[in-house]
């Protein structure tokens, strides 16, 4: 009787808790509208709204059978399996909760912005899965606009790797390309494998820029370029991104064309060989040592400007070739730089090599005295494009500085210093050998900080504030350089070291910062409302003249709202009473539906320019972007003045095509003429390998 009663209690508790059994030390619980346990077959059967949560996996279905000993499961009817980074759906699934291996029939998978379909999806033990006779797409429709169909597709959601074989790229059900193998990374890939950008440009004529990318793995890829320009002809290129295990990453880029110019008034159109070769490599040897190499070879001075204006020329018009190695230690740094002119049309100061040793501030014994040194040894050779006489010299330079920082009172920091710079030249400008130049330095840095917190909170002129905090930081720096033993006019000028001259100047600075607290992410955080910095140099009797202010610089930043930012910076010359530069920027980004930017650029006797950009989303399908640059005045290199003319005008119309974005752009440039181009972008991977757009420099 006791045995029978104990058995009944055990059975009652078992049924009350649902179908719950041990999987090693981890129980599996089956929940549903109807759950039954069959002791003889050692299985649990669930029906209706079945749910299992087990070790990061959530499985839902209409019906399921789970075997307690083997941990095998068979589920059918609206099967959904959710794992970290992916979701799988199908008609029927067989799965082992212990080995994590299984299969889904008539399956559909989702990982990030990508979808996959197949007759069968095999679940592998490492959380990856294999799709049989299926396809991938970023279009979520049951009949996608495009798809990458393949016999087999391997997907690993953890690192985003995709590997497909026997591939057909289809638009609708129409194949447009066949590939034996296709590797892709859902997390790191910048643009689709095949890209075509058609358009028209005044200098080029009609064009089609084509690229094909093949990924060897997530760290190395090869991009082939084949571009046709009706006026200039065919051009081809290769971009190879690589990774060397233990030796860093790099990029090799080539581009070649036999350019013809149909605009030339010649009976026979000749061809001009033009090319570029670029190599970049970075090796982070450890957390304190690194090496960088760059090599830029071009056929002529305008190669980059003519073919890669937006992508490269505007950012770096004349790149130089060099090798640089740096070892950073807590007490010092040691570097070696080798810069060599590769292109004869460039003006380059070669350094073959330059070795630099920098000893950071080191305390001497237990004294309140610190010592630092900066020493370089350089072989200099200045080469010019006009083949003028080269200027070369061997230079050894060392700067040694002693500093005694202290606090006079609690709020005032003072740091007086003395130093000397000794420079040895293998020869002077007039041919003298072994020239020694010595310069004595001294000075003092003073700084303090005041702050006040206003407890009031509320709104002023629409700006919310909570306990306004005002910080004032005045600084004074004095620098004195005694007349060097050799005048700069007697030395070859390679950089700032050679231009050192007598100086006695104060640099005055006043920084104001306004801060408040705002609710961000569920907690109060400190944000800047405004920032103003004014600095100026006061020169004491320079070159026999009276003392005067010089080089007054102002920097203003206002962020009254998180969606609005205003910046302005200027440089003023009190001697001539002229502003040398003055730049302003206003940027509004209140929502995803519209953004507005407006800026002005002023450089004395060179340019006065206005720039504006507007992005506006009309509805869920249409948007447009307009950008303009207008020169109120520009002085060209030849002295010719341009007044009240547009420099650039550009408009882009954007159409949302569900999984694609179609863009049509028209631009007019004073230098490049009229350009029209069209781009189709995947929403899941919107980057393209070519760039024509003008950009508004958004405030930081």
Task: Show the residue positions of the predicted features.
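A generic structural motif
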Residues: 36-38, 65-67, 154, 514, ...
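Bacterial N-terminal signal peptides
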Residues: 6-18
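Post-signal-peptide, soluble extracytosolic/periplasmic N-terminal scaffold domains
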Residues: 23-125, 210, 214-216, 242, ...
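N-terminal secretory signal peptides that target proteins for export/translocation
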Residues: 1-3
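Outer-membrane beta-barrel proteins and related beta-barrel translocases across Gram-negative bacteria
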Residues: 92-97, 101, 109-130, 134-137, ...
């Amino acid at each position: 009787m006791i045995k029978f009663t104990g058995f009944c209690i055990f059975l009652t508790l078992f049924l009350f808790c649902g179908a719950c059994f041990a999987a090693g030390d981890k129980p599996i619980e089956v929940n549903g509208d109807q759950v039954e346990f069959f002791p003889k077959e050692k299985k649990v059967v669930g029906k209706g709204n079945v749910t299992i949560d087990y070790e990061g996996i959530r499985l839902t279905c209409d019906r399921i059978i789970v075997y307690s000993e083997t941990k095998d499961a068979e589920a059918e009817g609206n099967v959904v399996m959710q794992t970290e980074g992916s979701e799988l759906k199908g008609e029927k699934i067989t799965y082992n909760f212990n080995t994590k291996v299984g299969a889904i029939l008539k399956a559909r998978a989702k990982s990030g912005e990508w979808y996959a379909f197949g007759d069968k999806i095999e679940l592998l033990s490492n959380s990856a899965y294999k799709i049989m006779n299926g396809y991938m797409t970023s279009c979520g429709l049951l009949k996608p606009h495009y798809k990458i169909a393949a016999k087999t597709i391997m997907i690993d959601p953890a690192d985003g790797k995709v590997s497909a074989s026997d591939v057909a790229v289809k638009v609708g059900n129409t194949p447009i390309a066949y590939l034996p193998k296709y590797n892709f990374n859902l997390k790191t890939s910048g643009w689709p494998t095949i890209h075509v950008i058609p358009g028209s440009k005044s200098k080029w004529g009609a064009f089609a820029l084509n690229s094909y990318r093949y990924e060897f793995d997530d760290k190395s890829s090869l991009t082939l370029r084949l571009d046709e320009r009706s006026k200039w002809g065919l051009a081809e290129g290769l971009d190879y991104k690589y990774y060397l295990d233990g030796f860093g990453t790099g990029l090799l880029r080539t581009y070649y064309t036999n350019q013809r110019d149909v605009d030339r008034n010649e009976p026979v159109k000749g061809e001009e060989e033009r090319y570029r070769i670029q190599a970049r490599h970075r090796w982070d040897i450890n957390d304190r040592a690194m090496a960088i190499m760059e090599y830029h070879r071009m056929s002529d001075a305008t190669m980059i400007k003519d073919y890669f204006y937006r992508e490269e020329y505007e950012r770096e018009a004349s790149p130089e070739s060099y090798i640089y190695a740096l070892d950073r230690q807590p007490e010092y740094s040691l570097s070696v730089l080798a810069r060599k002119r590769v292109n004869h049309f460039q003006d380059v100061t070669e350094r073959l090599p330059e070795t630099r040793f920098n000893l950071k501030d080191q305390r001497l014994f237990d004294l309140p005295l610190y010592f630092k040194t900066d020493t370089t040894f350089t072989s200099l050779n200045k080469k010019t494009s006009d083949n003028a006489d080269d200027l070369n010299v061997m230079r050894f330079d060392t700067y040694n500085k002693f500093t005694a920082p202290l606090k006079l009172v609690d709020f005032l920091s003072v740091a007086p210093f003395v130093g000397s710079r000794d420079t040895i030249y293998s020869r002077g400008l007039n041919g003298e050998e072994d020239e020694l130049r010595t310069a004595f330095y001294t000075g003092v840095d003073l700084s303090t900080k005041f702050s006040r917190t206003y407890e009031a909170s509320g709104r002023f002129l629409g700006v919310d504030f909570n306990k306004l905090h005002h910080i004032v930081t005045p600084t004074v720096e004095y620098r004195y350089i005694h007349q060097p033993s050799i005048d700069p006019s007697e030395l070859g000028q390679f950089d700032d070291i050679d231009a050192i001259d007598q100086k006695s100047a104060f640099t005055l600075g006043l920084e104001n910062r306004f801060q408040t607290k705002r609710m961000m992410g569920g907690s109060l955080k400190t944000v800047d409302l405004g920032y103003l910095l004014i600095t100026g140099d006061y020169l004491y009797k320079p070159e026999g003249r009276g003392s005067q202010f010089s080089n007054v610089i102002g920097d203003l930043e206002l962020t009254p709202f998180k969606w609005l930012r205003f910046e302005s910076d200027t440089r003023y010359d009190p001697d001539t009473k002229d502003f040398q530069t003055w730049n302003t920027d206003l940027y509004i980004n209140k929502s995803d539906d519209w953004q507005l930017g407006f800026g002005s650029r002023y450089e004395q006797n060179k340019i006065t320019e206005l720039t504006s950009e507007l992005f506006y989303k009309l509805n869920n399908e249409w948007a447009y972007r307009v950008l303009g640059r207008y020169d109120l005045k520009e002085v060209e290199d030849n002295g010719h003045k341009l007044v009240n003319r547009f420099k650039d005008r550009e408009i882009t119309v954007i159409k949302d095509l569900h999984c694609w974005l179609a863009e049509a752009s028209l631009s007019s440039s004073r230098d490049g003429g009229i350009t029209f181009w069209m781009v189709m972008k995947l929403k899941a991977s919107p980057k393209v390998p070519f760039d024509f757009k003008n950009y508004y420099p958004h405030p930081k």
